């Protein structure tokens, strides 16, 4: 990969640039690293259009959780601009009725002044069970929540609820693709990562041990190593591993 190729790292729901901070020292050697602003719109199409308007002509794209939903929308709008794709703890499916109901409840609570209680609930599903008492990770989730604010959280949830089904477009993805997840992601089961990897030609699947929904901070070294290999691999079509 050309060293000058920019790298865009899109955070997830209630996520901010802090989530990628542990990875930047390893990634910046492969190109300028930036974290797009994904908090200004309430629809995936609009979020992707704004990111594309502000992005370089061509870039490597990594999306975490909601950031993966945005990445799929970017692939629909401008596939030729994406040199490489990394899908981190995300899925291609649309929202389920159960998930939508939960999101609407979280929206109502956030608007009623219970935003930090909602962040506590999210934290419980975000981290590996062994990290539930990790005060530093809980603090990070709250700091990122404060970075975006309750109003942006509501916009993000609205965008997630209305996102399209990306499974029909998986086969059209032809750039080198990494699918990365944790072995105990209680927010998005890794079976859905396997589904994505199976639908994308040549995608590589990596499942990190002792990891939940936040691999960038739960397993930063393993995550950085996976992304460095993704960036440095010049093969157009990468093998898929179980």
Language-model-derived ranges and their functions:
Residues 63-67, 71:
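Gly/Ala-rich beta-loop-alpha elbow adjacent to hydrolase catalytic centers
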Residues 175, 189-198:
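Short alpha-helix in the alpha/beta-hydrolase fold that links the catalytic acid
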Residues 194-213:
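Catalytic histidine neighborhood in serine/cysteine hydrolases
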Residues 211-224:
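Catalytic histidine-centered segment of alpha/beta-hydrolase-like enzymes
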């Amino acid at each position: 990969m050309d060293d000058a190729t920019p790298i865009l790292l899109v955070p997830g729901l209630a996520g901010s640039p802090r989530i990628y901070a542990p990875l930047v020292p390893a990634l910046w050697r492969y190109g300028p690293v930036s974290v797009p602003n994904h908090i200004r719109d309430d629809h995936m199409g609009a979020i992707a259009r704004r990111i594309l308007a502000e992005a370089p002509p061509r870039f490597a794209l990594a999306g975490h959780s909601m950031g993966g939903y945005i990445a799929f929308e970017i692939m629909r709008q401008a596939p030729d601009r994406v040199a490489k794709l990394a899908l981190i703890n995300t899925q291609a499916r649309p929202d389920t009725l159960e998930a939508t109901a939960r999101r609407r409840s979280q929206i109502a609570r956030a608007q009623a002044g219970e935003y930090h209680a909602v962040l506590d609930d999210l934290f419980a599903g975000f981290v590996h069970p062994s990290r539930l008492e990790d005060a530093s990770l809980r603090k990070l989730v709250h700091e990122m929540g404060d970075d975006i604010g309750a109003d942006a959280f509501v916009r993000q949830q609205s965008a997630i609820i209305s996102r399209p089904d990306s499974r029909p477009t998986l086969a059209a993805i032809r750039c080198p693709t990494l699918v990365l997840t944790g072995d105990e992601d209680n927010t998005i089961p890794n079976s859905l990562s396997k589904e994505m990897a199976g639908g994308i030609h040549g995608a590589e699947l990596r499942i990190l041990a002792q990891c939940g929904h936040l691999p960038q901070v739960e397993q930063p070294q393993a995550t950085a190593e996976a992304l460095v290999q993704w960036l440095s691999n010049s093969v157009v079509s990468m093998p898929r591993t179980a």
